[in-house]
Amino acid sequence: MQQDYCPDIAKLAEGGFNKVFILRAKNGREVIARIPTPIAGPAHYTTASEVATMDFLRAVLKLPVPEVFAYSTTSENPVGAEYILMERVEGESLSSRWLSLTTDEVKDIMIQIAEMERKIFDFRFPAYGSLYHKKDLDWKHQIPIVEDFVIGPVSSREFWHGERSKTEIDRGPCRVSPLSTFPFILGFLEKEPTGTGLIIAVGLSPLDCVTSAARREMAVIQRHAKPQPRQTFLLPTNYNIHPSEHTSLLSQFLQVAPHLIRPGSYSAPTLRHPDLSLSNILLAPGTSKIISIIDWQGATILPRFMQAGYPAFCHHDSSQPQSLEIPSLPDDFDKMGIDEQRQIKAIFRLEEANLYYTAATGVHNEEHMNVLKIPHLGMQQYLLRQTGYPWDADVINLRAALVGITTPSVWSKISSAACPVEFSEEEREAAIAESQEWNESEQLLSRVREHLNIDLEGGTEPDNFERAVEGNRQLRIEMVRQAEAGQQEICWRNWPYKDQEDNSMPPQR
């Protein structure tokens, strides 16, 4: 842009973690400016890691990602914020074409995705963490890979938000030591041609990765958490729940964790896109050719069994085996109304995506398919996610996940060792019942979001704002009206889409 200064600036999009602008120069050239929001993660690491990840994928693995022209990992610049200037890719999002694609085009796209993922799976990273350019990290916190790329601390926002940024927790990696210093070590060995001979790049072990979220949350809870009532939608309590209930479950998980580790290539450090949604895949206009994969913010390198799974756009139910039956539209599809056709087509396309992604992965990325075959992989990954959620007096899903994984019929497929954690039959039944209530509550809340056309955090498009506000007000009042006697105030107070400062009382029935 320097050749034609003072570009025209227009906002392209704004989400919870980024603001995206188009910069247009007088000569017609356009670039994308991406500015992270304060809640995106640690300012320096978030920007530096996203830039390095895109540069690595483009330069080393030759994958189609936007070219980075310039960036700043500090707000001490004329812009007053961290930023990334990158290529604007002239493509159509997969989301805009999703329901109009032919089956052959869906197959082609799934093959391309599987082949790109294979290139990433095939690269032998020496440790776990996030990618950076060498110049963007202190020398003590980096493991060299290739060219000027290094692995450094995990940039994921979960490890930095709130009190976590001030708490000593494992974020990885790393130290680099002479080979002679460590005759044996749990970790990955990386041979680097240097002036002093071979070195070992030591990152977090697989067990460190599996337990890091639990240990992180235990550290924060022990220092900062206080008893509080559960404020979950439709499942609130009018009594305090003590943080020790959370840490006790995390302690039980730490006993289980060593048995979840998979040997050899199953634990290989693997990079994966953090959110491969339809909107993050760009196609060449009018074709099924993928020309860019965007939004690599928060991408990390973790053990393969933690990274394996279906892309976000598949909405795959990991608790169920993938059907090998070729999906088809109902015989009376042409007689349906437009809205019903759209709903049926969306389900049909989802079934196609799951089937053909599975097939493409089996043919083009055998390493990934082998991991997907791990018994109860979905249950294990679900448990790992639950250990990373912050204290909010809601431990329903963490308890249910532990109960599920330690069920004898499940545990026997995971480990040949005796399960180190036991629950009584009464505890199991109570946990399952509570989890079912939670799921029913979440399904209702999902219908509320769909009705209001809002996202998980209550955000919506500007032209839907007034409608969503009024609809939200009416639904909140209706919920109180239908609440049991004595529950109206709790229901009103725990409505999920209200201002934090809203301390009002419910209207009288």
Swiss-Prot record:
Presence of the UniProt keyword Nucleotide-binding in the record: no
GO terms for biological process, alphabetical: cell adhesion
Cellular compartments per GO CC: mitochondrion
A Pfam family it matches: APH
InterPro entries assigned: Aminoglycoside_PTrfase, Kinase-like_dom_sf, Mito_inheritance_9
Induction of its expression: Expression is regulated by the hypoxia responsive morphology factor A (hrmA).
Gene3D superfamilies recorded: 3.90.1200.10, Phosphorylase Kinase, domain 1
Keyword annotations of the record: Cell adhesion, Virulence
Function: Part of the subtelomeric hrmA-associated cluster (HAC) containing genes that alter the hyphal surface (such as reduced total chitin or increased beta-glucan exposure) and perturb inter-hyphal interactions within the developing biofilms, resulting in a loss of vertically aligned polarized growing filaments. Consequently, this hypoxia-typic morphotype (called H-MORPH) with altered biofilm architecture leads to increased hypoxia fitness, increased host inflammation, rapid disease progression, and mortality in a murine model of invasive aspergillosis.
PANTHER family: ALTERED INHERITANCE OF MITOCHONDRIA PROTEIN 9, MITOCHONDRIAL, AMINOGLYCOSIDE PHOSPHOTRANSFERASE DOMAIN-CONTAINING PROTEIN
Protein name according to UniProt: Subtelomeric hrmA-associated cluster protein AFUB_078990
Organism name: Aspergillus fumigatus (strain CBS 144.89 / FGSC A1163 / CEA10) (Neosartorya fumigata)
